[in-house]
Regions:
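Conserved catalytic cysteine-centered active-site region
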Residues: 37-56, 83-137, 264-292
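Phosphate/pyrophosphate-binding loops at sites that engage ATP/ADP/AMP, CoA/4′-phosphopantetheine
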Residues: 30, 61-77, 176, 230-247, ...
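Flexible, glycine-rich active-site loops centered on histidine and acidic residues
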Residues: 130-163
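Condensing-enzyme catalytic core mediating Claisen C-C bond formation in acyl metabolism
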Residues: 1-50, 153-222, 226, 230, ...
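Buried hydrophobic positions in well-ordered alpha/beta secondary-structure cores of metabolic enzymes
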Residues: 8-10, 36, 65, 76-79, ...
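Active-site pocket-lining segment
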Residues: 220, 224-230, 243-266
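Acidic, glycine-rich active-site loops and adjacent beta-strand->loop/helix elements
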Residues: 13-14, 82-88, 113-118, 141-146, ...
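Catalytic phosphate/nucleotide-handling subdomain of diverse soluble enzymes
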Residues: 290-310, 318-325
Length: 325
């Protein structure tokens, strides 16, 4: 008996042209390149140009993913966009992406789970494919976090960047074995008791302003390592695989120390972790699809590889996906 799986058909990304090296922050903040690198592993990040919106980044990443998949937009049933930095309060930025891509069928909507957004969006797309709601789905993570930074706060503004990544998921019949391609499991969590650890101090119904990012870095670090390892372990158990079988861990690229500590807790050597944080900074929901696309382009991620993607973000919200590339 055949089993339906949501398989990765294509992947792509887009990074804004403007690159900000750590040294630039030395001009306006009490910080140094060494200080930033030692605490985060970040060396540079990309910032969107004036007038360059989240939807613009998302469209370019989606186009690259479609090209990689060998598909046209007319063959897509749905678009799910993970973002915390939408173009407008409404409509959903995904519908602007839908229009820009020339898609006149199906449906498009946004998912907001901050840095965990892409994992949540991927789980949504997987469920829609398995239920027959859609056959092919573009899942995008796109962010312009440079628009919500407090440029006087050296503990946060040096950490984030802008960018977008996308994958095309396609329904595929398989034998249902863990060796078959596709999403093998998902694991999602949130706990609103910790919402004050990472948030933006603005909103439509509260302040009528966009606000700026606020973070209790040390507390987030402690929660991140424990929760990321736990959700990765839970997803692997659901998939019937073990850490020693994993070819690549593709983590949310927030902080190199978090990434290393989580990998150690999972029992995965850092050599089997896809790292892009040094070049991108924390791109929130865009970080995992960016890492998937860059990892493939580098020749790290190959067809048949077993991957674990895990992320945590404001909410707190966290989760993991196990998939066979």
């Amino acid at each position: 008996m055949k089993t339906l799986r949501a398989t990765i058909k294509g992947v792509g990304h887009y990074l804004p042209e403007r690159v900000i090296e750590n040294a630039e922050f030395e001009k306006t903040l009490d910080t140094t390149d060494d200080w930033i690198k030692s605490r985060s592993g970040i060396e540079r990040r990309h910032f969107a140009a004036e007038g360059e919106l989240t939807s613009h980044l998302a469209v370019k990443a989606a186009q690259n993913a479609l090209t990689d998949a060998g598909l046209t937009i007319d063959q897509i049933d749905a678009i799910i966009l993970a973002t915390s930095t939408p173009d407008q309060t409404f409509p959903a930025t995904a519908t602007k992406v839908q229009a820009a891509l020339g898609m006149q069928r199906g449906f498009a909507f946004d998912v907001q789970a901050v840095c965990a957004g892409f994992v949540f969006a991927l789980a949504n797309a997987n469920a829609m494919i398995l239920s027959g709601q859609a056959r092919r789905v573009i899942v995008i993570g796109a962010e312009t976090f440079s628009r919500i930074m407090d440029w006087t706060d050296r503990s946060t503004c040096v950490l984030f960047g802008d960018g977008a990544g996308a994958v095309v998921l396609e329904a595929t019949e398989t034998d249902g074995a863990s060796s078959d391609r596709g999403i093998l499991s998902t694991d999602l969590h949130s706990d609103g008791r910790f919402s004050d650890l990472l948030y933006v101090d603005g909103g439509v119904s509260s302040t009528q302003t966009a606000g700026v990012l606020k973070m209790e870095g040390r507390e987030v670090f402690k929660h991140a390592v424990i929760k990321l390892a736990q959700t990765a372990d839970a997803a692997m158990e659901k998939a019937g695989v073990t850490a020693d079988q994993v070819d690549w861990v593709v983590p949310h690229q927030a902080n190199l120390r978090i990434i290393k500590s989580t990998a150690q807790k999972m029992g995965v050597p850092i050599e089997r972790v896809v790292l892009t944080v040094q070049d991108h900074g924390n791109t929130s929901a865009a970080s995992i699809p960016l890492a998937l696309s860059v990892g493939k382009a580098r020749g790290q991620i190959k067809r048949g590889d077993l991957l674990v993607a895990e992320a945590i973000g404001g909410g707190l919200a966290w989760g993991a996906v196990v998939l066979r590339w």
